[in-house]
Design a protein with these regions (language model features):
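Accessory helical-bundle/CTD segments and flexible terminal tails appended to RecA-like ATPase motors
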Residues: 1-133
């Protein structure tokens, strides 16, 4: 599969299930994904997760990524669980409460991208659980 076609297929994925299916296909084809391809897959996962309904906005804030959770999600999330999760994944994260929204500030150093993907996946699970109660 030529690189351009591969990258286009990754960026055309609109849902995590599509991306996971493509990732499985690539692993079956190539074995371990080359670092460059893996980084593109990670970036696309992050982009897709940033469009979840519990996220109000995500901003690049000069050395940090700022994730603003919606007022609705901020009102019903278990703050202690969020605090524990964020502090387990990141060194020196910042949590703020602005205009009834929880804001998470994460330094964009080291393994910030895979850890942020893990954070967003966990928040997605919390959101889904709260909607089924």
């Amino acid at each position: 599969m030529e690189k351009l076609n591969l990258y286009q297929r990754i960026y055309k994925a609109q849902h995590l299930t599509q991306l996971q299916s493509l990732e499985k296909e690539l692993k079956d084809l190539y074995g371990t994904l080359p670092r460059e391809v893996n980084n593109i897959v990670l970036k696309r996962k992050y982009e897709i997760l940033c469009t979840q309904p519990f996220i109000d906005e995500v901003k690049d804030a000069g050395g940090y990524v700022q994730i603003m959770l919606t007022q609705e999600f901020s009102a019903h999330i278990a703050g202690d669980q969020l605090f524990e999760l964020v502090n387990r994944l990141f060194d020196k994260p910042q949590l703020k409460y602005i205009k009834n929204e929880i804001v998470i500030m994460i330094q964009t150093i080291g393994q910030w991208l895979p850890h942020t993907i893990e954070l967003l996946n966990e928040l997605k699970k919390m959101d889904e659980q709260s909607r089924h109660q």
